[in-house]
Amino acid sequence: VVEYLNDNYSELKWAVAARNQEKIDAVKAELSCDVPAILLDSTKMEDIEKALSLTNLILTTVGPYQIYGNDILMMCAKHGVDYVDLCGEPGWMFEMQKHLATAKESGARIVHSCGFDSIPSDLGVMLLQKIAKERFGKPVEQVKCRVRSMKGEFSGGTAASLRATLGKL
């Protein structure tokens, strides 16, 4: 996400956040990324409050959300800050509906699962639309996608989300 924003949206005002400064510094150095950095430990309310005071949107890619996402989502809903994640934890998302009225009242928009298992297809559609515009002068109106086979493994975050979910059963 950081690499994509850095490479494609230089005019956008954004910052990178992480739980420890070393990780932030490493990512910024690796990508030659010159954006502000925010130290944000989602278990510390003061870190969340500070981050929310600096932004209009939190985009979080750090799960398990049922461990690291509760307070961030709750505070976004309370303070009118938009929230986007790539969560694949349906039980947690259902539980977070308790903040819906607060989010509506404050104007916060809550978007779950934006990118969860869809990044390959989203990128495919983006490239298809780019080619369609180049060849036909307009994007296609509808795209259908099917998966015949998959190779890959669970990421560390996916495995942690599974453990956290099973721990609640």
Short names for language-model regions:
Residues P64, M74-M93:
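ADP-ribose/adenylate-binding Rossmann-like module
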Residues V1-Y9:
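N-terminal Rossmann NAD(P)H-binding glycine-rich loop of SDR-like oxidoreductase domains
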Residues I38-Y68:
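Conserved Rossmann-fold cofactor-binding substructure of NAD(P)-dependent oxidoreductases
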Residues V111-D117, S121-L169:
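Conserved anion/nucleotide-ligand pocket segment
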